[in-house]
Swiss-Prot record:
Its EC number is 3.1.26.-. GO terms for molecular function: mRNA 3'-UTR AU-rich region binding; RNA endonuclease activity, producing 5'-phosphomonoesters. InterPro entries: DUF402 (IPR007295), FomD-like_sf (IPR035930), Ntdp-like (IPR050212), RNA-bd_FAU-1 (IPR016730). Keywords: Endonuclease, Hydrolase, Nuclease, RNA-binding, rRNA processing. This is Probable ribonuclease FAU-1. It comes from the Archaea. GO terms for biological process: rRNA processing. It comes from Saccharolobus islandicus (strain M.14.25 / Kamchatka #1). It holds the Pfam family DUF402. Belongs to the FAU-1 family. Probable RNase involved in rRNA stability through maturation and/or degradation of precursor rRNAs. Binds to RNA in loop regions with AU-rich sequences.
Length: 424
């Protein structure tokens, strides 16, 4: 076995199937997941945790130590992968300007433990602690606290028998969720090691890898197919779950259930546009009014009219933006690009075409979301201009080679279409 993995959240069924097939031992399953796979709940400590990102369930986080990185890239070939350059629970020292590397540090402690990696450009610290997969130990008021997942009173009393003696010596102990699944002897030895490490300041090897994966629609659809092999699953299950959790559960009680009504309900008169960059950061583009839509069991197509106001020039096209200019753009669940046709507000003449290459767009309530693949194409006065290919190569550190190759393949396809006057 490669390691013990705990999986939580809306992707749990599909990921349990996938990581089981990759020789990981699945532990701490919910009763529902154990029953689906006709197994007993495996109450053992986890080496790695995979779960929904609490701020956006369109992303997953992976935490722990093990050789999972390559498998993550292979499982999520068409998604963005961010690995923290600083390990979770590692001990770092901020400089005088309250930074560490290129990241701002908050609060500005001279030394502290990383409790939030810098996925938003900021490291959050807490006071220095010795950390294992079972517990945290540090000097303080001599109290014991528990993970929110340890809520059984009998279990808390069991753990208190071990931590109370340390509390009386002035050590704080926080029990992590894994502690529920270890023996008293394992936990006792672990606490002894943590105290020694804390007093000797041995933090060099402390910390856990942290990955943030922004899931694409193609990878969600793959997870749909995996889940479908285990339990009744409609197409777009994992996408729809982000907006309609209970409604999807209700729909799937009917084996002939169709996602069309839920897909239609996601489309409002005006749609926002969430344009996600390779490092996982979102840019919100000017949204647009829906002027045409088509939804069926196989997918969806939405055409927007976006009003373009302000000064400046149109990106890639180079023509000045004038009052009343507008963009007509189609988002198609089958296409890895969107064609923006920019028109003059004065005489409705075509000013130019800009093609954004991205993963196929997904729908959330009143919002279109896609992963931007950096490389784009502009058509200016019949000239074809390939934009930001160097950015694609630079940002490839966040992508599987399959996604990089797909972006270049789509760009070449579009160039051929333009040259043959077959752009649709």
């Amino acid at each position: 076995m490669k390691g013990r993995v705990r999986i939580r959240g809306i992707y749990a069924t599909a990921l349990t199937s996938i990581f089981s097939s990759l020789s990981y031992e699945i532990v701490q399953q919910s009763v529902e997941i154990a029953e689906r796979f006709m197994r007993e709940v495996n109450n053992l400590p986890a080496d790695i945790t995979i779960k929904d990102f609490e701020y956006d369930r369109g992303k997953i986080i992976v935490m722990g130590n093990g050789t999972i990185e390559e498998d993550l890239h292979d499982v999520f070939k068409y998604s963005f992968h961010w690995k923290s350059p600083i390990k979770l629970y590692s001990v770092i020292e901020a400089d005088e300007s309250c930074t560490y590397g290129n990241f701002k540090v908050e609060p500005c402690l001279e030394e502290g433990i990383v409790i939030k990696p810098p996925y938003d450009g900021k490291i959050v610290l807490s006071e220095t602690k010795a950390v294992s997969k079972y517990a945290m130990v540090w000097r303080g008021k001599g109290v014991t606290t528990f993970s929110e997942h340890i809520n059984n009173e009998e279990e808390r009393l069991r753990l208190l028998t071990l931590s109370s003696p340390l509390n009386r010596k002035g050590y704080n102990v926080k029990w992590r969720s894994n502690a529920k699944y270890a023996t008293l002897n394992e936990l006792k030895e672990d606490l002894e090691r943590l105290v020694l490490r804390y007093e000797n300041r041995e933090f060099r090897d402390q910390g856990e890898d942290f990955y943030l994966i922004t899931l694409s629609l193609p990878d969600k659809l793959h997870l749909d197919e995996v889940r479908k092999s285990i339990v009744n699953t409609v197409k777009y299950h994992h996408m729809l779950k982000l907006s309609y959790n209970r409604e999807v559960d209700s729909l799937e009680k009917d084996k002939e259930g169709s996602p069309v009504k839920l897909l239609e309900a996601l489309i409002s008169d005006f749609m926002k546009i969430e344009h996600i960059k390779a490092d996982g950061k979102a840019i919100y583009l000017r949204g647009g009014k829906v002027i045409e839509k088509e939804v069926n069991n196989d997918g969806y197509r939405i055409t927007l009219r976006r009003e373009i106001n302000g000064n400046g020039v149109l990106d890639g096209i180079g023509k000045r933006i004038e009052n009343g200019d507008y963009d007509i753009v189609e988002y198609n669940s089958d296409k890895w690009y969107q064609i923006h046709r920019y028109y003059s507000g004065i005489d409705n003449s075509l000013k130019g075409i800009y093609i954004n290459i991205s993963t196929p767009p997904e729908l959330l309530k009143g919002k279109i979301r896609y992963l931007d693949l950096e490389i784009d194409i502009a058509i200016r006065d019949s000239e074809i201009i390939v934009l930001d290919e160097d950015e694609l190569n630079k940002k490839s550190i966040y992508m599987h080679s399959s996604l990089v190759n797909k972006a270049k393949e789509v760009a070449n396809y579009l160039i051929d279409c333009i040259q043959q006057n077959k752009l649709i």
